[in-house]
Curated annotation (Swiss-Prot):
It is a multi-pass membrane protein. It comes from Methanocaldococcus jannaschii (strain ATCC 43067 / DSM 2661 / JAL-1 / JCM 10045 / NBRC 100440) (Methanococcus jannaschii). Keywords: Cell membrane, Membrane, Transmembrane, Transmembrane helix, Transport. It is found in: Cell membrane. Belongs to the CitM (TC 2.A.11) transporter family. PANTHER family: TRANSPORTER ARSB-RELATED. Its main location: membrane. This is Uncharacterized transporter MJ0456. InterPro entries: Cit_transptr-like_dom. One of its GO terms (biological process) is transmembrane transport.
Length: 352
């Protein structure tokens, strides 16, 4: 069993146990779950995955890459950009396979390929921290704390800037000889998916009711074979059940410590290393009123251990054996520590 599947099933099992023990009545689940977050994730998964499956994301990526010989840097910044718009997980499903294809048409050494794939994983975690739709934890915080879109992005800019500065010294700026002869022609069906994506964004940001475009999403699922990670969605639903159950039996208070904003950021980042950043986000949001230290902490904490972020597991899974686990942990750990130290210094100066 894959480690991410094991983690998902563990959280689901805890929720089922809480229901069986009648700590939570099954009828209460509807009111406990943050359905805005669930529907946001579901809609984004459907639209973004179909854009990926129909090669629209490959089309955009290749258009950008064909204009650059500095493939290493181009792919890293493409990852940073895409992960802020289409989530860190999906961006990796586009970028890493594309990287492996492009590698065949370059003179890039395998050690640089390994380094590139690792930093694509790291960059996906950093880039996704900028926007409410960049990753599941941001999407949850966005709805749970009722944060404005612009407010969220402006507050996360320092996180993004210092994250990019942390990885820059390690990147390869040299040029590689490239002969990218892959050609993808524009498809008319993409226009429909682009418009659907815009409608989904309007829902996520509160301009449209989620019910209005549910028929559209269901129609797409009926007529197209779209891969949706239903296990992840189910896990997210049960996370709300888990947290409510732990709150009722008093265990959640174990995770509550008296701390200021800077210490909360550090705490959130460390907790993410142990239980992964999505569960850490849901847990801490029920204990603390200030969203920003949690957002910084869980996004910093995405890099480091394998389970810190699901994006880390995806990076290794997609690398086709080109990445050593030890090397991945070393680089991820170094970036985590550097990013945390710099943001602690920033927070001590600018946070009240």
């Amino acid at each position: 069993m894959k480690i991410d599947t094991f983690i998902f099933l563990m959280f689901i099992s805890i929720g089922i146990l809480l229901l069986l023990l009648n700590i939570i009545n099954p009828m209460e689940v509807f009111h406990i779950v943050e359905w805005k977050t669930i529907f946001s994730l579901f809609y984004l998964m459907v639209i973004i995955n179909i854009m990926r499956d129909t090669k629209f994301l490959d089309y955009i990526s290749l258009k950008i890459l064909k204009k650059s010989k500095r493939i290493f840097i181009a792919l890293i910044f493409l990852t940073l950009f895409l992960s802020s718009l289409i989530t860190n997980d999906v961006s990796l499903f586009v970028i890493i396979p594309l990287t492996l294809i492009i590698h065949r048409y370059t003179n890039m050494p395998f050690k640089d390929l390994e380094k590139l794939i690792i930093f694509e994983g790291v960059s996906a975690n950093i880039g996704s921290g900028l926007t409410p739709i960049g990753n599941p934890q941001n999407l949850f915080l966005f709805h749970f704390y009722n944060i404005g879109t612009l407010e969220f992005i402006i507050n996360m800019i320092p996180f993004e800037i210092f994250g990019i500065l942390a990885i820059l010294p390690f990147l390869e700026f040299k040029k590689y000889d490239t002969k990218i002869n892959i050609d993808i022609k524009f498809k008319k069906e993409w226009i429909f998916y682009i418009l659907s994506f815009i409608l989904v964004l309007l829902c996520v940001f509160g301009y449209l009711n989620f019910i209005y475009i549910l028929p559209l999403i269901l129609a797409i699922l009926m007529y197209k074979r779209v891969k949706v990670d239903y296990l992840f969605l189910l896990t997210f639903i049960f996370l709300f059940v888990d947290i409510e159950g732990l709150k009722r039996i008093g265990i959640i208070n174990i995770f509550s410590i008296k701390c200021g904003n800077v210490m909360l950021m550090i705490y959130a980042s460390l907790l993410s290393q142990i239980i992964s950043n999505v569960p850490a986000t849901v847990l801490l949001s029920h204990l603390y009123k200030n969203w920003l230290p949690i957002a910084y902490g869980v996004n910093i904490g995405g890099n480091g251990t394998l389970i810190a972020s699901f994006a880390n597991l995806i990076t290794l899974r997609l690398s086709n054996g080109n990445v050593r686990v030890g090397r991945f942990l070393l680089i991820g750990g170094i970036i985590y520590i550097m990013h945390l130290i710099v943001l602690v210094a920033y927070a001590k100066i600018f946070w009240v």
